[in-house]
Amino acid sequence: MKKILFVASECVPFIKTGGLADVCGALPKEFDKNYWDVRVVIPDYSCIPEQYRNNFEYVTHFYMSSGPYVQDKYVGVLKYEQDGVTYYFIDNQEFFTGFSPYTSDTKFEIEKYTFFDKAVLSMLPLIDFKPDIIHCHDWQTGFLPVYLKNEFAANPFFWGIKTIITIHNLKFQGIWDREWVQGVSGLTDNLFTPDKLEFKKDANMLKGGLVYADYITTVSDNEIQTEYYGEGLNGLLSARHFDMQGIVNGIDYNAYDPQTDGRIYCNYNASDFRKKKFNNKTKLQQDLGLAVDK
């Protein structure tokens, strides 16, 4: 049986701010569990609804330093199972407490997710789970492939693990002062070069993931390889185009079924959608105080 670990900063039904959460919530459920052992790990945000948090199971804990500036931090590991998928949650109240999963403090966010990336790898031997593939998502998981190919490379447990990183939003890359990022990550000097983590003399988490991941997927076919849409990384992405695939997002047909979706005014199906979609449009126009028309 092959093993896959999804690593992300958000995942439905636990926490969602955008489409990333939909993908990480829907895709793991679709694997045939007879052939795939699929698990997911996200931070244990205090804003995850109590209906889930009250059912989390304690797995283990340990203490970890991610760099000279981040020493001896508590890492708790919690677990929850749903729809045949095991979800893990990395617990640290210093980083993951608040009314929202994210803050506007970029410096803190980079420190937080650098810690998260290293904690995810560090927990794997303790829970006795060695994935064949680790599927990373967006800049928040960018340092995981970097750690795997460098700091963790000497440990036989991690040999043979492959990584994929998916870009959901290239505009956000996790960029900050190189010296400070090195201080919170513990990554060595030789990694902060223009062909690796350096970006315009700063450090770039997403770039690190794109350099060190074994494969890259995007939610568009080829736009990000162009200068206009490449957000400064189009050269790197073009250089790796043989290891990259564009996969346009689909939808969860159970969550977005117009026959059963309770979030629309009037449910419909293939035989009556013309009439009933008009009813939905009319109700929306009325609710927003717009002129009602066809």
Language-model features: locations:
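Catalytic cores of nucleotide-sugar-dependent glycosyltransferases that transfer UDP/GDP/TDP-activated
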Residues: 1-294
